[in-house]
Curated annotation (Swiss-Prot):
Family: Belongs to the papillomaviridae E8^E2C protein family.
Cellular localisation: Host nucleus
Pfam families the UniProt entry points to: PPV_E2_C
InterPro entries tied to this protein: E2/EBNA1_C_sf (IPR035975), Nucleotide-bd_a/b_plait_sf (IPR012677), Papillomavirus_E2_C (IPR000427)
Cleavable signal peptide: none
Keywords for this protein: Host nucleus
Region (Disordered): 1-123
The keyword Coiled coil is annotated on this UniProt entry: no
Source organism per UniProt: Bovine papillomavirus type 3
One GO molecular-function entry: DNA-binding transcription factor activity
Major subcellular location class: host cell
One Gene Ontology term from the biological process aspect of the record: regulation of DNA replication
Stated role: Plays a role in limiting the replication of viral DNA in keratinocytes. Recruits the host NCoR/SMRT complex to viral replication foci to mediate repression of both viral replication and transcription.
Name of protein: Protein E8^E2C
């Protein structure tokens, strides 16, 4: 004979229930894995975001490196041991300044007066420079007189005093219609320098009726 007993008490909270599966550790492990994966993702993203800045800083450092080479101090100019002149032609300028002097070209020495036989290479600037340049012009004498008198004077001087002058011209006259000085013939006598002209005037006798004028040309 079987008797079934039923309890009238409702199941309480402290009453043990049947076997249950433990789900809490599984949820904790899954959440831990998610947090770990999210941490690794953030690290990767941070590393990627930092990589361009590091590359930029490297490129800036490389671009700044050539500028550092330009800031190196230059070596001082050392004058040449043989000539004692600094590079760049500084000595030449000094020599030119010494030759020209403070006011322009230097005047010629007494032996250089009238020694130029050709036209000047450059045009002189200023009155003083023109006078100095004219000092190198070969001196001449302009003789004016009768044609026969000038011809005989040239023949006699060429035979007796050839060392007192450089050259003589033939007798000539002005042919222009506008010229007012047509009376008489003229003849030019050229010299090496002013000293030779002084010697010519002191040695050779000028005939009567012949006038003599001093002058100079840029060239002969």
């Amino acid at each position: 004979m079987k008797i079934f007993l039923q309890s009238s008490l409702p199941p309480g909270p402290n009453r043990r229930r049947g076997p249950q599966t433990r789900g809490h550790p599984r949820h904790k492990s899954a959440s831990f894995r998610r947090s770990a994966s999210s941490g690794s993702d953030t690290r990767d993203s941070r590393g990627r975001s930092r990589s361009p800045s590091s590359s930029r800083s490297r490129s800036r450092s490389r671009s700044r490196s050539p500028s550092g080479s330009h800031s190196r101090p230059r070596a001082p100019h050392v004058p040449d041991q043989e000539t004692g002149r600094p590079p760049g032609g500084g000595g030449r300028r000094g020599s030119r300044d010494q030759q020209q002097g403070p006011g322009g070209p230097a005047p010629p020495s007494p032996g250089e007066v009238g020694t130029r036989s050709g036209p000047p290479e450059t045009k002189a600037k200023g009155r003083l420079a023109e006078l100095i340049s004219a000092a190198y012009d070969p001196p001449v004498l302009l003789l004016q007189g009768c044609a026969n008198t000038l011809k005989s004077f040239r023949r006699r001087t060429t035979q007796s005093y050839p060392h007192t002058f450089l050259c003589m011209s033939t007798s000539w006259t002005w042919a222009s219609k506008t010229c007012t000085v047509k009376s008489g013939h003229r003849m030019l006598v050229a010299f090496v320098n002013s000293e030779q002209r002084t010697l010519f005037l002191a040695t050779v006798k000028i005939p009567k009726g012949v006038t003599c004028l001093k002058g100079s040309f840029d060239g002969l």
